[in-house]
Swiss-Prot record:
Gene Ontology CC terms: plasma membrane; proton-transporting ATP synthase complex
Organism placement in taxonomy: Bacteria, Bacillati, Bacillota, Bacilli, Lactobacillales
Record's bilayer topology term: Peripheral membrane protein
Protein name as catalogued: ATP synthase epsilon chain
Compartments, as annotated in UniProt: Cell membrane
Amino acid sequence: MTFMTVQVVTPDGIRYDHHANFISVKTPDGEMGILPEHINLIAPLTVHEMKIHRTDDPNHVDWVAINGGIIEIKDNLVTIVADSAERERDIDVSRAERAKIRAERKLEQAQSTHDIDEVRRAQVALRRALNRISVGNK
C-alpha cells in the first residue's frame, strides 16, 4: 500500500509526524485533498482544520489546527511549515475560548475607533481561536 509521510513543523519544532493515506488542507483558493503519489506542489495555507487519515488505523482521523503557513509536497513527503499548529489532544479548549473572548473585545474596540490594522489583527486572532476551539472539540 502506498502512503505518504506528513510532517507539521513550527518554530517550536515538529508538531506532527505520521504516515497517512489522505489529508485535507485549506489554501486561499479552497480546500484540497491530497493522496499518495500527488504531484510536487508548494502552496500557501490559511487558518484551518487539517484532517489526516493515518495508515495504521483506517477508522481514526487526526485533526490539527493549522494557523497559516505553507505546504510542500514532494516524493510522498508532505511538509507543512506553519506559524503555529496544535493537535486536537493538545488544545486547551477553555484557554482557546478565553482567547476568543479577548479577540472579540479587541475587534469591537478596533471597529469603534476605525483602526483598520487593529481590526485585521483582531480578525486573525478570532479566526485562530475559533479554529482551535473547533479542533479541540473533535
